[in-house]
């Protein structure tokens, strides 16, 4: 399963791990992706989303209905 937030689109980044001796090796910075079930009153059902913790804060701010409308407008099936 891909590590991409359905709300923000956050995905893994590539960077360096830097040692005390300043040696650099490649590493991945992974987003904090969570599976979360939300109750959608208008549809009378639960919706499960894979989203980052920032995505959860966006849902708290805008509401689940507005966020679902944006996701569906992108053509993603929920």
Swiss-Prot record:
Single biological process term from Gene Ontology: translation
Entry keyword set: Ribonucleoprotein, Ribosomal protein
Annotated GO CC locations: cytosolic large ribosomal subunit
GO molecular function: structural constituent of ribosome
Disulfide bonds: none
InterPro entries referenced in this protein's UniProt entry, alphabetically: Ribosomal_bL28 (IPR026569), Ribosomal_bL28/bL31-like_sf (IPR034704), Ribosomal_bL28_bact-type (IPR001383), Ribosomal_bL28_sf (IPR037147)
Recorded superkingdom: Bacteria
One family name in Pfam for this protein: Ribosomal_L28
Entry-linked Gene3D superfamilies: Ribosomal protein L28/L24
Similarity comment: Belongs to the bacterial ribosomal protein bL28 family.
Protein's UniProt name: Large ribosomal subunit protein bL28
